[in-house]
């Protein structure tokens, strides 16, 4: 499970020019426990900046890309309105799909290996199977009122409750964006805005952790909360020399939260300098974070590879170390 700050992660703002998606790598490595639901689901009330680029699979096969659920709708029928076919029965759909798939396979046989075509063939089958289970999975109204009250009434709380329901049903990777576009990118009025945003998600995060513990899922679920950079410790000054009480981007020192899934609880690892500007003690690179996440999911990050352009690629490229001090 990963919560994002809804900024342009696909633009590689922390300096890497190789844009790869960690969640697609997890799905590639683990597969899916539930063949009726996608292995990677991305929820956002609308779209984050750069839209669908954020859950594409990079150079991995398209079957590992995420499925976007627009959570600005509260009705389950609206949430998954494009999954159900209201004109054809399941039997009629199956006959229609079998014919389309026959044509697709004949087309594929005349071409060299085409990952995009193979992904499309598989996506049609997944869309058909999703009709069996998607309605139940996304319908939080089936939860007792006490559970819904526990999570809270915000959009973010509702997304987190959906995330728990998806995890229960075997979805490997659930990504939860906090707000559409980039609400955390506050170059002005940062204190007021961040307090509001924190209030929208804090109750739901606490409820999710407690709920997973009570259901025996906490130790099997890795929760990662954070973004791709922090904010400067100093107020940002505009070109006109005025302050709007905001902060600029800062990739030199910021924090993330990991919980569950083999993480040692109550641990603080690393520290910034006295100004809160850059990591000064036990700095962690994004490759180290990825290596640690993969380790907690049962992978050796140096051995999980995908061959592309005549090279065996890793999520961590040629870098990365497992941060063993935070592992229980």
List the predicted regions and their residue ranges.
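Short, exposed "boundary/linker" segments that immediately precede the start
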Residues: 1-9
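Ligand-binding pockets and gating/stacking loops
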Residues: 11, 16-17, 21-328
């Amino acid at each position: 499970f990963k919560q994002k700050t809804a900024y342009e992660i696909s633009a590689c703002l922390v300096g890497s020019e190789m844009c790869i998606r960690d969640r697609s790598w997890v799905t590639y490595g683990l597969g899916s426990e539930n063949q009726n639901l996608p292995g990677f689901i991305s929820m956002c009330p609308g779209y984050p900046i750069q839209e669908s680029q954020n859950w594409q699979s990079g150079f991995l096969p398209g079957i590992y890309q995420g499925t976007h659920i627009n959570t600005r709708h509260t009705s389950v029928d609206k949430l998954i309105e494009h999954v159900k076919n209201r004109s054809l029965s399941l039997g009629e759909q199956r006959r229609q799909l079998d014919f389309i798939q026959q044509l697709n396979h004949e087309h594929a046989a005349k071409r060299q290996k085409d990952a995009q075509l193979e992904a499309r063939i598989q996506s049609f089958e997944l869309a058909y199977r999703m009709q069996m289970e998607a309605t139940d999975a996304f319908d939080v109204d089936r939860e007792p009122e006490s559970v819904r009250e526990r999570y809270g009434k915000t959009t973010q709380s509702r997304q987190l409750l959906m995330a728990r329901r998806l995890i229960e049903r075997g979805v490997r990777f659930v990504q939860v964006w906090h707000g559409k576009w980039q609400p955390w990118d506050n170059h002005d009025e940062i204190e007021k805005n961040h307090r509001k945003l924190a209030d929208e998600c804090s109750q739901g995060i606490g409820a999710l952790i407690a709920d997973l513990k009570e259901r025996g899922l906490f130790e099997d679920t890795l929760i990662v909360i954070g973004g791709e950079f922090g904010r400067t410790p100093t107020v940002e000054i505009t070109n006109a020399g005025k302050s709007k009480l905001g902060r600029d981007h800062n990739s030199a020192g910021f924090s993330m939260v990991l919980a569950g899934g083999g993480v040692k609880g109550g641990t603080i690892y690393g520290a910034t300098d006295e100004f809160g500007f850059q990591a000064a003690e036990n700095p962690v690179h994004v490759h180290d974070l990825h290596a640690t996440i993969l380790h907690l999911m049962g992978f050796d990050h140096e051995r999980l590879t995908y061959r592309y352009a005549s090279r065996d690629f890793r999520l961590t490229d040629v870098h990365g170390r497992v941060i063993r001090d935070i592992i229980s």
